[in-house]
Amino acid sequence: MDHEDFVFSLMHAEPAVFDAAVIDSDGNLVYQTDNWEISADVDQINHLVTEVLKEDGKKSPSLKIMKLKYMIVEFTPERIIATNVQRKGHIILAPVGKGKASLVTYIDPSKGPRDALFNVQNFASKLEDEF
């Protein structure tokens, strides 16, 4: 699968998604949009995905991506939703499969994360065959 085409298809289907990244089942960043540099944040993202998939996983109160802090408002095996309290956007992290694979998206600050949730989760499910 061409991850760049995949991400741009998501962004075309869901205009509220401003940036996105794909992390594979080994926890490696395999694609990110050009203006979103999250390689320094991948370990934290992998930890959250690992915890959310455990029966007794520990919810973190927040996460930082590109030095911006987001408060985690939903923590389920299907999704992790976080929002920046200074209105600088939202993060939807959609785990894929049973490993560390995930689709990570940055959502338009003027929209709510739920506006993009259906399309983000729908696209994340398309990654399951790969990861």
List PLM regions with ranges.
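Non-catalytic interaction/Regulatory regions outside core domains
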Residues: 1-131
